[in-house]
Amino acid sequence: MSVEQTYSWLRKAGSIDDLAHYIIPLFSGAEKKNWKGILGHLQHHGMFKNIKEGIQTVSKLKEKGFYGHIQKEEQYLKNKWQGPDVPIVTLPVDERNRRIRLEFGSKSGLAFQDKMFLFLSSDLDFGSVSALMTHEYHHVCRLGHLTKEEKDVTLLDTIIMEGLAEYAVYERFGRSQTAEWTTWYTPEQLQALYEKKIAPHRDIKRDNRLFPQLLFGKGYQPKMLGYAVGFNIVKKYLTASKASTADGLSIPAETFLDAML
């Protein structure tokens, strides 16, 4: 993995669009004309929207030693899971996004099989960043084991991936760094939510309007529904089989459902 020196990108940028020069090459086959779509995707997942605020935040991240910490974490995680070398792109989080502040603790991330984005506030502590990196890099490793094309990925595939990644955080740090949504529902409630809301739609794809509603708990759905159910399924399965999230990297999503029988 390589930690991109993004603070130098922002120092030279007059606008967010100027970051295209650095980010577009990370997306295989993408052209500069695709920048708006890529920008929108990154911002949808938590990237900053105000260039002046972004420059201030990234300067503080550098001053406080975040880049050095991220470099140490990358080596630890790569060794832990025998994972691939991927670029790590650290950028300011959108601190005006209320949902990211309240539900994700002013941090967010986005993982691909060949790269990883971290969106951070300069007010975070190193432990929070380690937890986020653990979650996102587990995604990178899991994606390397998936044989499906992105268009064929199901709701079940996704909630298991999210559950595994957050359980990796729990496995490493215990409750101290695990997301709050893992405590919002009792095991009994999660079993019922799986049977009533997730199971009937487990095979839907990302292009189905129900997908984000069930995954994130939007609209009238319980908050963080898919994430919480996925975490519960993974926890039950790994506990019963005395396995770790490293073992879980290659286990098919359907196999985890043995825990719900």
Curated annotation (Swiss-Prot):
Entry's Pfam families?
DUF2268
Q: Tell me the protein's name.
A: Uncharacterized protein YjaZ
Task: Name its species.
Answer: Bacillus subtilis (strain 168)
Annotated InterPro entries: DUF2268
